[in-house]
A protein has these predicted regions:
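Redox-cofactor binding/interface segments in oxidoreductases and associated redox assembly factors
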Residues: 92-93, 116, 172
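A short helix->loop->beta-strand "cap" motif at the edges of active sites that frequently abuts
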Residues: 110-112, 137-139, 245-247
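Predominantly a Rossmann-like dinucleotide-binding segment in NAD(P)-dependent oxidoreductases
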Residues: 140-142, 147-230, 238, 258
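ADP-ribose/adenylate-binding Rossmann-like module
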Residues: 110-123
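Conserved PLP phosphate-binding loop immediately N-terminal to the Schiff-base lysine helix
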Residues: 120-125, 129, 149-151
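N-terminal glycine-/serine-/threonine-rich beta1-alpha1-beta2 phosphate-ribose binding loop
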Residues: 1-110, 128, 132-137
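NAD(P)-dinucleotide binding in Rossmann-like oxidoreductases
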Residues: 230-233, 241-286
Length: 286
């Protein structure tokens, strides 16, 4: 899929070719780096639901790197991977949202660290199980939160938040095209727009202020997708009131029309006691 095949697999191809550069702690950028890399990396397996998808991913990886991982497929292919590679160091999870938890828990039970796409899971019960399992075995569960590394966002965190005073309220928007919910993903009835992309923004505001939520309200609408026989939320609006007195509204949908001016619409703003900052990621405006 989009995350597994385009985002994760290409990142691991860079690691396969170049390793992790010593001292820099980052992926090498050329074919000579691996000879000097402090950590070597081997993608030993790819696992998907269908055989065709697994074979395609393995073939693409071989084309990019010259190394072909073993391909697995089925309803629970991660179990086969862990059986064949019991000493696996890291399991990367980019399944549909509602299928993260069984893979993560199986990896932790095996003693394997985890990298997972957001959201880590979809409810607090699963969240508690994952945290308990990771802590019990001293393992890391890393969740992909790349919004915090956008240059504009780092500037807000390190500089602008110190200039606008105490935060009063904020707004964060990430809206996806209708194609995502009607064609790209087949599992939207098992998740919702906020669970899918909202964690990027909740993580970002945590990264800015390190203030915990004190209260939360959420509403959602089902009007557009039901016309296509899809029983899923079109949009979700979440208000989070934080311990520091700040209130933030998170707006997410996956029903933008095909002729919208950008592939997605995203941005956020913060109003403080002494100033205001606006950041529009659609145009990279600040």
């Amino acid at each position: 899929g989009m995350f597994g095949g385009d985002v994760h697999l290409r990142a691991y191809a860079d690691l396969q070719r170049a390793g992790l550069s010593p001292n820099l702690g980052r992926c090498g950028l050329d074919q000579w780096t691996r000879d000097l890399a402090g950590i070597e990396f081997d993608l030993v397996a790819v696992a998907t639901r269908s055989e065709a998808s697994a074979q395609k991913s393995a073939a693409n990886f071989k084309e990019w790197t010259g190394h072909e991982p073993k391909a697995y497929h089925g309803e629970t292919p991660w179990e086969d991977v862990l059986r064949d590679f019991p000493d696996l160091d890291v399991m990367a999870v980019s399944t549909p949202d509602h299928l993260h938890t069984p893979v993560v828990l199986a990896a932790l039970e095996n003693g394997t660290h985890v990298i997972t796409e957001k959201p880590m899971c979809l409810n607090m019960t699963e969240d508690d199980l994952i945290i308990e399992a990771a802590n019990a075995k001293g393992l890391v569960v890393g969740v992909d939160m790349h919004k915090r590394y956008d240059p504009d966002h780092m500037r807000i965190r390190d500089d602008v938040t110190n200039k606008i005073g105490d935060p009063v309220y904020g707004l964060a928007v990430l809206e996806e095209p209708l194609e995502v919910s009607t064609s790209t993903f087949k599992w939207v009835e098992d998740s919702d727009p906020f669970s899918y992309v909202g964690p990027h923004w909740t993580d970002l505001f945590w990264h800015y202020y390190h203030s915990k939520p004190a209260a939360l309200t959420a509403v959602g609408q089902k009007k557009r997708l039901v016309r296509d026989g899809i029983d899923a939320y079109d949009a979700v609006q979440v208000r989070v009131d934080y311990a520091n007195g700040m209130s933030v509204h998170y707006h997410n949908n996956w029903i933008l029309p095909a002729d919208f001016e950008g592939p997605v619409n995203q941005g956020h703003e913060i109003t403080g006691t002494d100033g205001k900052v606006e950041s529009d990621q659609q145009y990279r405006g600040f």
